[in-house]
Amino acid sequence: MNVKGKVILSMLVVSTVMVVFWEYINSPEGSFLWIYHSKNPEVGDSSTQKGWWFPSWFHDGTPSNQEEEDIDKEKRREKEQRKEDDEEELQLWDWFNPKKRPEVVTVTSWKAPVVWEGTYNKAILENYYAKQKITVGLTVFAVGRYIEHYLEEFITSANRYFMVGHKVIFYIMLDDISKMPLIELGPLRSFKVFEIKPEKRWQDISMMRMKTIGEHILAHIQHEVDFLFCMDVDQVFQDNFGVETLGQSVAQLQAWWYKADPDEFTYERRKESAAYIPFGEGDFYYHAAIFGGTPIQVLNITRECFKGILQDKKNDIEAEWHDESHLNKYFLLNKPSKILSPEYCWDFHIGLPSDIKIVKISWQTKHYNLVRNNV
């Protein structure tokens, strides 16, 4: 074949390839992909979010007519699905039986369930939420020496026990992202790592997380998950922490105080503080190590708590238990729709009384002299 023939043949081959690619990118399968990395985490900060996007080749970013039709079809399908889901909405008594645990408080005065082992029907819940195709987020903060002492075990155990069988996104907030451990996540699990500003005092770290969580919910989390939990890093999952914990707003009973009288609780008792709760008031003592709900409800929680923290700073006062004091004040005024028993956040230093059937999460040993920069 002469040179002219080779040129013509090459041009035909290139044209064919381009036509094939053009047909592919204008098909539904040619849409862009979002890649979550297990070993190479996405890195961001509190105001921006970076990711890796792989657009279809030769795509100018403008949807084709076919793509617009596909989007419209998908929207109609989702609308119909939501209508069906509303008709099949799971009722409390479909899955919850308080009589299974008569020795403990299982229903609050405002009719919210207190979830203990044995009170819920796991099969019904799993079947319901599997149809919903939910995504659950989990935020955790690790700064300074908390990273090396607690983070890897927390994430590894969460990977094993948190919302098994459902899509999960871990939102990991670090003051030094270079110390992020390499962790291989299981199926349906991904994580995003964000760098946060270091604080001089651990008390400020604890309180400022309310602001940071709220910022991230507004920036992206509200569009990424259906439910969100916020947890302390110095604890470890021991057993399945599943969909029985999901709700509009979820509070955690504090292990040391769940049997105490409200007047014994370590609420903030000074009237000058925004977290003030007078004697004679209060329902339960809630642990700030775990709280959650829908993204919008968690946003409300963090906003109101941070508002109280700022008010206290303005008045030159600091609540006794920092963000936890403000969280208890919030839940006094805005009752949680679901409460988790101490089984979901237990301290083995208490022992193991008969009403604690299965420990879902346990406290880690508190090495405050090692991990806090001001004790």
Curated annotation (Swiss-Prot):
The gene is GGTA1. It is found in: Golgi apparatus, Golgi stack membrane. Residues 57-83 are annotated as: Disordered. Substrate binds at residues 141-146, 232-234, 254-257, 266, 366-372. Glycans are attached at N300. Synthesizes the galactose-alpha(1,3)-galactose group by catalyzing the transfer of a galactose residue, with an alpha-1,3 linkage, on terminal lactosaminide (Gal-beta-1,4-GlcNAc-R) disaccharide borne by a glycoprotein or a glycolipid. Preferentially glycosylates proteins, can synthesize galactose-alpha(1,3)-galactose on glycoproteins but cannot synthesize the glycolipid called isogloboside 3 (iGb3). Mn(2+) binds at D232, D234. It comes from the Eukaryota. This is N-acetyllactosaminide alpha-1,3-galactosyltransferase. Its main location: Golgi. GO terms for biological process: carbohydrate metabolic process; lipid glycosylation; protein glycosylation. One of its GO terms (cellular component) is vesicle. PANTHER family: GLYCOSYLTRANSFERASE-RELATED, N-ACETYLLACTOSAMINIDE ALPHA-1,3-GALACTOSYLTRANSFERASE. Gene3D superfamilies: Spore Coat Polysaccharide Biosynthesis Protein SpsA, Chain A. It is a single-pass type II membrane protein. It catalyses: a beta-D-galactosyl-(1->4)-N-acetyl-beta-D-glucosaminyl derivative + UDP-alpha-D-galactose = an alpha-D-galactosyl-(1->3)-beta-D-galactosyl-(1->4)-N-acetyl-beta-D-glucosaminyl derivative + UDP + H(+). Its EC number is 2.4.1.87. Residues 1-6 are cytoplasmic. It is an enzyme of class 2 (transferase). The active site is at E324. Keywords: Glycoprotein, Glycosyltransferase, Golgi apparatus, Manganese, Membrane, Metal-binding, Signal-anchor, Transferase, Transmembrane, Transmembrane helix. Residues 26-375 are lumenal.
